[in-house]
C-alpha cells in the first residue's frame, strides 16, 4: 500500500467537533434538486409544477446529453421550478409525500441487458447517479459514452469537523465493495481508493492509497497530483465515498438510495453530531432547533442540500 504525507495545509481549530455517532435527522417536508450543483449544466425540463413524481422520476436532463437525467429524490409533487437570471435553473422543489417509497426498480428495468458494462452504465445514467462523477480537468459531469483513464474514489474527508469516513463506510461495507466493483467497469485503467492514515478499509482485488496530513490531504485533486495527474489529453474521474455507497445499494437492491450522513457542528451547534438525512433535504426542516444562532451555520459537504438563508 502506497503512503503519502502532506506537511502543509489547512487545520482550523474550530470548537464544536461532532460526536462520531450517527443519529436520525428530522424528516424533511420538502426536498430539492439544485441546478448550481452541476457545473456546465444545460437543463431541459421533463416535468411541470404540480406533477406527481416517485423516487427516480427524471425531473430534467442535460440538453447536450439527454441520457444524463436528474431525478426526484422522493415520492411527492413538484411544488416549484425556480429560475434565476437568464432563466438559469436554480432548483426543482418537491413536496414530500413518502420517504419510504422505493420508487423505480432499475434492476428489473434493465434486466434484459446482457453486457454487464452496458448494464452498469445504463443504470447509473437512468438513476441519476451518473452525475456523482466529476471529470478532471474541468470538474464537469462526464459525457455518457466517455471512458476515463482512471477513477479516484475519495474514501476520506479532511475538512474541519467532517464525518469519519471509515465509520460511515463500515456501516455499509458490502455496499461500498459492490459500488467499487461496479464503478471499476467504467474504465480500463486503475481505480484508486484513497483513504486516511491508519484507516483499516480494504476492498478485495483493489489497492488502497493512504494519505496523511491536514486539508487538502483528503481532496481528489491532491490524490490525482500524486497518483495519476490529468492533463489536456488525459481525463480522470473522481467520486465520493457516499456516492459509492449509493451505487452499491443501487445494484444490491435495484433501488435508488438517497440517504446521506452529514455533520452538524461548530461552536453554535447545540449538540454537534452526525445526522442521517436525505439528498436534497430542506435545511429549514433539518436544522430547526439545532443551532443557538441560525445566522451563522456550518455543515460538512458530502451531500447536496437545499440551500437557504437566514436573516
Each language-model region and where it sits:
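N-terminal, Lys/Arg-enriched amphipathic/low-complexity engagement segments
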Residues: 1-46, 61, 211
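Single conserved hydrophobic/aromatic residue that forms the stacking wall/gate
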Residues: 297-311
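A generic structural signal for short beta-strands and their flanking turns/coil linkers
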Residues: 29, 72-74, 90
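Mobile cofactor-carrier "swinging-arm" domains
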Residues: 1-14, 21-22, 79, 84, ...
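Generic structural motif
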Residues: 37-41, 53-56, 65-80
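Buried, small/hydrophobic-residue-enriched core segments of structured protein domains
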Residues: 68, 82-285, 289-296, 300
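Acidic, glycine-anchored pre-beta loop/turn
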Residues: 47-56, 82-85, 280
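Hydrophobic heptad-repeat coiled-coil signature
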Residues: 53, 59, 302-304
Amino acid at each position: 500500500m502506497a503512503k503519502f504525507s502532506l506537511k502543509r495545509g489547512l487545520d482550523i481549530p474550530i470548537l464544536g467537533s461532532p460526536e462520531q455517532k450517527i443519529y436520525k435527522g428530522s424528516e424533511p417536508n420538502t426536498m430539492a434538486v439544485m441546478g448550481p450543483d452541476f457545473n456546465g449544466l444545460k437543463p431541459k425540463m421533463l416535468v411541470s409544477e404540480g406533477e406527481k413524481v416517485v423516487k427516480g422520476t427524471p425531473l430534467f436532463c442535460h440538453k447536450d446529453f439527454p441520457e444524463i437525467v436528474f431525478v426526484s429524490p422522493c415520492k411527492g409533487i413538484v411544488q416549484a421550478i425556480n429560475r434565476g437570471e437568464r432563466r438559469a435553473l436554480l432548483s426543482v422543489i418537491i413536496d414530500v409525500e413518502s420517504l419510504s417509497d422505493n420508487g423505480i426498480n432499475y434492476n428489473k428495468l434493465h434486466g434484459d441487458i446482457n453486457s454487464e458494462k452496458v448494464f452498469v452504465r445504463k443504470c447509473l445514467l437512468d438513476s441519476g447517479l451518473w452525475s456523482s462523477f466529476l471529470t478532471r480537468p474541468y470538474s464537469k459531469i462526464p459525457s455518457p459514452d466517455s471512458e476515463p483513464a482512471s477513477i479516484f474514489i475519495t474514501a476520506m474527508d479532511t475538512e474541519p469537523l467532517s464525518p469519519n469516513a471509515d465509520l460511515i463506510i463500515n456501516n455499509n461495507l458490502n455496499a461500498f465493495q459492490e459500488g467499487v466493483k461496479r464503478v471499476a467497469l467504467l474504465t480500463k485503467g486503475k481505480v484508486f481508493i484513497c483513504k486516511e492514515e491508519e484507516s483499516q478499509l480494504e476492498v478485495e482485488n483493489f489497492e488502497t492509497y493512504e494519505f496523511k496530513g491536514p486539508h487538502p490531504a483528503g481532496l481528489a485533486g491532491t490524490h490525482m497530483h500524486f497518483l495519476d495527474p490529468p492533463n489536456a489529453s488525459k481525463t480522470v474521474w473522481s467520486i465520493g465515498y457516499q456516492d459509492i455507497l449509493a451505487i452499491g445499494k443501487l445494484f444490491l437492491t435495484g433501488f435508488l438510495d438517497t440517504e446521506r450522513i452529514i455533520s452538524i457542528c461548530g461552536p453554535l451547534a447545540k449538540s454537534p453530531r452526525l445526522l442521517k438525512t436525505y439528498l436534497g433535504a430542506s435545511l429549514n426542516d433539518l436544522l430547526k432547533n439545532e443551532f443557538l444562532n441560525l445566522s451563522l451555520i456550518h455543515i460538512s459537504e458530502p451531500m447536496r442540500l437545499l440551500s437557504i438563508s437566514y436573516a
